[in-house]
Amino acid sequence: MNQAFWKTYKSKVLQTLSGESEEDLAEERENPALVGSETAEPTEETFNPMSQLARRVQGVGVKGWLTMSSLFNKEDEDKLLPSEPCADHPLAARPPSQAAAAAEARGPGFWDAFASRWQQQQAAAASMLRGTEPTPEPDPEPADEAAEEAAERPESQEAEPVAGFKWGFLTHKLAEMRVKAAPKGD
């Protein structure tokens, strides 16, 4: 289809949606000064990185999103998000005692929680396939585990991933969900 067809179609659709008459549209076409130059200004959502990510992820499908979101619950969200500052100004520095308490009370990180939940679900799925009852594993205390690892290995902690969790595994699963959700062609 050519561009003129789409312009005509668009004007007809806009006309029916807005309720303008054809005479008003013809008058605007004849006198372009009546039509203000409408510059397409980008909305706030266009610059928001989360909305850009959401647009990219939308091809994953509902099933994949539900699978990923089932790994987390409201308690995790409350633990992972920092509490709002209680000072008069949001940029004001916290008192040292409050900052130290917040650092100590902080639980496992986002990816630590993700990895442990993922492993628990995989173990449960494997035991269901074998026909046995899944045994829930308690989450290890992250502070104790980190202290033990630091005592055992004084070298860099970033050398190995947490509890054998590989980033390649996560990316493989995401790609696998995307392929399953993609429409099948001829």
From Swiss-Prot:
Chain positions covered by the region annotation Disordered: 17-47, 77-105, 121-164
Annotated transmembrane regions: none
Tree of life domain: Eukaryota
Comp. bias (Acidic residues): 136-149
UniProt biased composition (Low complexity): 90-105
Protein name: Uncharacterized protein C1orf232
